[in-house]
Design a protein with these regions (language model features):
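C-terminal catalytic "cap/lid" subdomain
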Residues: 1-261
Length: 261
């Protein structure tokens, strides 16, 4: 989405194109992500002589228009601006900017990241998946929308955490297992410290204790663990966090369940 926002910004500046709203940028990214995954997946299935229906589905994820986080946006998106540019854009569009710590004198737009509470087309996704189709959905966390007083869907300027969205979608379609792929094969206690320890199995209670103690990085592993807990809390049997290249190797991956077996 950040790249799309920067391309959009260039189009506005160079050619006078109308700016895209953030929900449209998320939808744009979903189309790209879905296309890339679907095309490659179809090719892989063909290489293995397998015939399966593959479908990419736009996902509108419902959020609460009164979510408190909407009053305190923290998710940085788009390019870095000067203070003068940021002030001008804030006046023109009502955007909120925060100073960029890593770049002196730089400012970036910040948007809220509301919690996902529902997923449109959940019943359809479940039906297609149970019939044997491979469904690609939830790209970029989904397009945030809210339900207005008349029951109509309205866009909301924000981005949804992709792991929380995946957990919610998984629970809504009654999936048994959730897999979150990252760049490490396990959850670690004291990550990259001399006392580093692999946590191969976690139940809900122990995972919550670690989160409350601040054991995991808020910008990395903690949100993924919260997503896993949300999934098993809503009926999922097991959530796994592992490295993408280790997905097929059962020796790797941290497993999270409601209770230890």
């Amino acid at each position: 989405v950040g790249n799309i926002l920067m391309s959009d910004d260039a189009g506005v500046k160079m050619y006078g194109l109308p700016p895209m709203t953030l929900d449209m940028c998320v939808a744009y990214s979903q189309g790209e992500i879905g296309y890339m995954i679907e095309r490659n997946l179809r090719n892989i299935l063909r290489e293995h002589g397998l015939t399966r229906h593959v479908v990419s589905m736009i996902s509108q994820v419902v959020v609460d228009e009164h979510d408190p986080v909407l009053q305190n946006p923290t998710k940085r998106v788009g390019r870095i601006y000067t203070r003068e540019e940021a002030d001008k854009l804030a006046a023109e569009h009502g955007w909120i900017f925060k100073e960029e710590i890593k770049v002196e004198g730089g400012w970036r737009r910040v948007v809220p990241s509301p919690a996902p509470i529902d997923f449109k087309n959940a019943a359809l996704v479940e039906r297609m998946a149970r019939s044997g189709s491979i469904v690609i959905t939830g790209g970029g966390g989904g397009i945030p929308v809210y339900v207005d007083g008349e029951g109509m869907l309205q866009p909301l300027e924000g981005v949804i955490d992709k792991d929380l969205a995946s957990a919610m979608i998984g629970a809504r379609v009654k999936a048994d297992e959730l897999y979150i792929l990252t760049d490490v094969p396990y959850i670690y206690k004291d990550f990259r410290k001399p006392t580093q320890e692999v946590l191969e199995f976690l139940d809900y209670a122990d995972a919550m204790k670690y989160l409350e103690a601040g054991t995991f990085g808020e910008g990395s592993m903690a949100p993924k663990i919260r997503a896993c807990l949300s999934f098993v809390e809503k009926g999922g049997q097991k959530a796994v966090i592992t490295e993408a290249t280790k997905l097929e190797d059962r020796r790797y991956g941290s497993k999270i369940t409601m209770h230890y077996d």
